[in-house]
Amino acid sequence: MQTISTLSQLSINSDSRVLVFMPHPDDEAVFCSGFLKKLTSNNIPVKLITLTSGEKSTLVFSLEPGDDLAATRRIEQKNSCEILGITDYEILSIPDGGLKLKETEVKEIITRQINIFKPTHVISLEPDGIYGHPDHIGLSKFVSEVVTSPINLLYVTIPEFEKKRPVSKMSEKSVINPIIPEFCLELKNTETEAKIASLRAHRTQFGLFDTSSQNFGFFKATKLLNSEYFTYR
């Protein structure tokens, strides 16, 4: 794995256009918000497509009685994008937990967004969906099948350390094997600060303790607080 600190080391430059597909609100914050902040800080066009509203999440920190989780998570995503400097984004309404059952619709969305935005690079989760979530796996599969040369497909992944951790209860697999990263992208302090703020914007998904400066246990354990991980297809 090569440790890098600049976009040029990922073959992304001022002529690049980066289109990002994520399954749920907060996936961008967890896995690539530092990278996204690096893109916008360098004035590289970026568009974020979130396929679902995340309405099936079992995490409801700070959700007031009577509040609609999907609507709340859409607002959280908007706030996260503002923090990251992303002005071009869409939050779609593919059913949370049912993305794999919508292959034709999702592939049409991916194709349409590629035709509209004309990216040089497409970003999505690696084929095992990081931790086996069926929506993650489905989106990665559909993106991988639609994206063809000359567009570059860059997978977000995790360091090998994480593979030894227990599989999430949301996983549809008993064993997961995320792609080994080619690149460890080190984040500047300002990018880490933006990542923390982006995570905190998703208030229903991350309790204050989870994102307190004294804790961040998950992100320290997965080495995702100060670095993010990528592999080209």
Feature map (PLM): residue ranges:
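Active-site rim/loop-helix segments in enzyme catalytic domains that contact anionic ligands
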Residues: 1-118, 145
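Metal-dependent de-N-acetylase/amidase catalytic core
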Residues: 2-19, 101-233
